[in-house]
Amino acid sequence: NNCPGDWLPMNGLCYKIFNELKAWEDAEMFCRKYKPGCHLASIHIYGESLEIAEYISDYHKGQAEVWIGLWDKKKDFSWEWTDRSCTDYLSWDKNQPDHYENKEFCVELVSLTGYRLWEDQVCESKNAFLCQCKF
């Protein structure tokens, strides 16, 4: 584990919640600029999902939802991760994703589900966000 103190180590990567509110694209750019190879977080198994949820519940200040790196770039329900990892696990909240009013193409962790489940959201919404890095 080479993660700095306030990062969550998991499966060879490090994760950190940033509490400043940003639109999805700005959050992804922030993660990328933080260090080469960083992105908004991708989640691939239920266990990771739970560990991340627990970490966010401990360290997230405020009520904002939390961006992760999943988005519908083509706007056709073909979800992809910004780190280009495979979309092999999805943890949608009920009746999600719904592209509500054909405006929701970015994915957030839902605070009401303890950050365990996901929903699509308007990409311009300002949220806290979860970066993933290798150190």
Swiss-Prot record:
Residue ranges of every copy of the C-type lectin domain listed in the record: 10-132
GO cellular component, one term: extracellular region
rRNA processing among keywords: no
Tissues of expression: Expressed by the venom gland.
Pfam families, sorted: Lectin_C (PF00059)
Compartments reported by the entry: Secreted
SMART domains membership: CLECT (SM00034)
Disulfide bonds: 3-14, 31-131, 38-133, 106-123
InterPro entries in the record: C-type_lectin-like, C-type_lectin-like/link_sf, C-type_lectin/snaclec_domain, C-type_lectin_CS, CTDL_fold
Chain residues that bind Ca(2+): 96, 98, 104, 120
UniProt induction comment: Hemagglutination activity is inhibited by D-lactose (MIC=1.75 mM), D-galactose (MIC=0.75 mM) and D-raphinose (MIC=3.5 mM). Is not inhibited by D-glucose, D-sucrose, D-maltose, D-mannose, D-fructose, D-threalose, and methyl-manopyrosonide.
UniProt keyword list: Calcium, Disulfide bond, Hemagglutinin, Lectin, Metal-binding, Secreted
Highest taxon in the source lineage: Eukaryota
PANTHER family membership: MANNOSE, PHOSPHOLIPASE, LECTIN RECEPTOR RELATED (PTHR22803)
Quaternary organization: Homodimer; disulfide-linked.
Job description of the protein: Galactose-binding protein which recognizes specific carbohydrate structures and agglutinates a variety of animal cells by binding to cell-surface glycoproteins and glycolipids. Calcium-dependent lectin. Shows high hemagglutinating activity in the presence of human erythrocytes, which are agglutinated with a minimum hemagglutination concentration (MHC) of 2.5-0.35 ug/ml. Causes indirect nephrotoxicity. Causes reductions in perfusion pressures, renal vascular resistance, urinary flow, glomerular filtration rate, sodium, potassium and chloride tubular transport.
Further comment found in the protein's record: Negative results: does not induce direct vasoactive effects in perfused arteriolar mesenteric bed, and does not potentiate bradykinin contraction in the ileum.
Protein name listed in UniProt: C-type lectin BPL
